[in-house]
Structures are given as structure tokens and as C-alpha cells.
A protein has these predicted regions:
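Active-site cofactor/substrate anionic-group-binding motifs, chiefly glycine-
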Residues: 24
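Glycine-rich hexapeptide-repeat left-handed beta-helix
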Residues: 20, 28, 34-36, 40, ...
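Single conserved hydrophobic/aromatic residue that forms the stacking wall/gate
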Residues: 1-12
Length: 145
């Protein structure tokens, strides 16, 4: 089952949410962009926190994403990985199974490595990015529905 919280920012076109064996929960204000795949395995539900941006062509598989994080274009996050709050996961990063990323981390590479703590400016930029997509969804939903 896919559980979308009230106040969802947006789920764009052409992505796949497969909650066929475990639940997928997408938190309030989060956005899932074009071409992303969200899937689970037995024993590995998927949870996306509040106000998360999941970039284009991302693969989330049985993992947990903390509030106010940004997952860059083409990143892959595998079973039982846990991304903390306020994290920035770089484009094309690979987060392997069971990896735990602390709050406020910048992660790049394949496999992904924490390179430093994000700055206050980067935290603000993540929030602004998420707000941009929330505003887009509000505009879009008024014109379509």
C-alpha cells in the first residue's frame, strides 16, 4: 500500500510507487519527481519524511528518508538504509544496504560517503527547493482539478 500524507507537495508523472509487499509512506509536503521508482522488499518498508525532495530518476528501495532532505537526481538508496534529517544526497550517489547517514550530512559518490556537515545556507536552500515544488503543485492542481 502507498500511504500519502495529507498536504502532499506532489507526485509528478511517470514514476513508479510499488508498495506491493510492504508499505510506502510519503510525508506531508514531500515531492517525488519524474521517473523515480519507489519499491519495497519483504521486511523493508519505505518511508519518506516530511518536506523531502526526491529528484528525477531516483531509486528508493526499502529505505527511510528523514525530514527536510534532498535526494539528488539519479541517486540510489537501498534496503534498510537510513538517511537522517536535513541531508543532501548528491546526484548519482549510491547508498548501500544498511548504511546510516547522520542528520545534516552532505553525501556524494558511489558508494556514497559523508563528506561534511551541510551549512545553514544549504539547509535554507533545501527548504526553498521544497517550497518551490509545493508552490508548483498548488498552481498545477488549481489548473487541472
Amino acid at each position: 500500500a502507498c500511504l500519502l500524507s495529507r498536504g502532499l507537495g506532489d507526485v509528478y508523472k511517470r514514476q513508479t510507487l510499488r508498495g506491493d509487499v510492504e508499505n510506502i509512506h510519503i510525508g506531508e509536503g514531500s515531492n517525488i519527481q519524474d521517473g523515480s521508482v519507489l519499491h519495497t522488499d519483504p521486511g523493508y518498508p519505505l518511508k519518506v519524511g516530511k518536506n523531502v525532495t526526491v529528484g528525477h530518476m531516483v531509486m528508493l528501495h526499502g529505505c527511510t528518508i528523514g525530514d527536510n532532505s534532498l535526494i539528488g537526481i539519479g541517486a540510489v538508496i537501498l534496503n534498510n538504509a537510513k538517511i537522517g534529517k536535513n541531508c543532501l544526497i548528491g546526484a548519482k550517489a549510491l547508498i548501500t544496504e544498511n548504511k546510516e547517514i547522520p542528520d545534516n550530512s552532505l553525501v556524494i559518490g558511489s558508494p556514497g560517503k559523508v563528506v561534511r556537515e551541510i551549512t545553514e545556507e544549504e539547509k535554507k536552500a533545501i527548504i526553498e527547493n521544497t517550497k518551490h515544488y509545493q508552490d508548483n503543485w498548488k498552481r498545477y492542481s488549481k489548473s487541472v482539478f
